[in-house]
Amino acid sequence: MTSWASENVTTKTATELAGDIKAGRFTAERAVRAMLTRINELDRSGPQLQSIITTNGQAMTVARAIDEAMQADPNLGGLLQGVPVLVKDNIETREMPTTAGSLALVDNNTGRDATIVARLRSAGALILGKTNLSEWANYRSQNGVAGWSGVGGLTRNPFDLNRSAGGSSSGSAVAVAAGFAPVALGTETSGSIVSPAAAMGLVGFKPTVG
């Protein structure tokens, strides 16, 4: 049995996990530790799903700070207090590079959050890392493969490693399906959320603009 199995954290929905953290049944630190362990076992090694481009080096520190704040005031926090969230790597995050999967942007540290990331943080979410994608959220050529990027390699379908994970928000869908986080952000112009969500048997939601 793997080390994360007994945690019973990685199979929970965001709502369930937020409720457990608020009620003191889990800590944010325990949730983050379990998910980082699972990423190391299944994304970096094992089947090497390659859904994650980078993890947040500050995640454990942030999780401990959240736990300490909630111990001092149990009523503290938003709807996602302490819940780990993954973000597609074409969405800016202040503490991690935003590469869009391209080697040209591996050092693209903007030092700021996209509006949607700032709103997640204000709701208490913990940004766990950045997910792989079809490079530039599109195909580089007519022979391009969904879910491949120069930075992250080919995102692999956890249900069948020989099948496509869809794209372009491949890493976000695979990461949720594999239990690396209960929720992840994607982007979509034409099918980039719904395609990988369908391939993973997940709900993919693209809100209307305006």
Say what each PLM segment does:
Residues 2-106, 136-138:
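Short, well-ordered alpha-helical
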